[in-house]
Amino acid sequence: HIILENTAQQFLIQQRSDSKESRPGQWDITAGAVDAGETSLIGALREAKEEVGLTVPSRAVRFLFRDQRPHCFHDIYYACFPFSLKECTMQASEVQALRLVSDQELIALMQQQCHRTSFYKTQLTNFLENRSKFIASCLQ
């Protein structure tokens, strides 16, 4: 998973394609499974490129936390860099719409998602509410 924030302090969310088996039509951050031989970081960067057409500068990426599940785990990354919706291209099989939202809108969205663990929701909310040091480096 990778949380993408632009220099206007807006977060990119994507609406999952209605043809997806899992959570069709749901709004979410960019996420996906890693391919064989990939690290979670490389997988997150690849998913951002494939699903929304953004090349995320590796220097802009920070690891946030790992959400451990019984049979898998989700590594959560954050990246802040200059981008706009005009620069995005949707992968039609995965994404049907894109939006930019505020930190509070993103928190509200994540809190509503029943497939997210309480640990995930708490960690993400804490990060979003206390990310000033990350924003400072992004805006330089």
What is the predicted function of each stretch?
Residues K20, R46-E50, Y77:
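Recognition helices and adjacent regulatory flanks at domain boundaries
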Residues H1-F11:
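Conserved N-terminal beta-strand and adjoining loop/helix that marks the start
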Residues T7, R16-D18, G32, R66:
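Histidine- and/or cysteine-centered catalytic micro-motif in compact active-site loops
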Residues D18-D28:
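A basic- and aromatic-enriched beta-loop-alpha substructure that forms the phosphate/nucleotide-
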Residues I13, I29-R62:
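The catalytic Nudix box helix
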Residues R16-K20, E94-A97:
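Short, solvent-exposed aromatic-acidic interface loops
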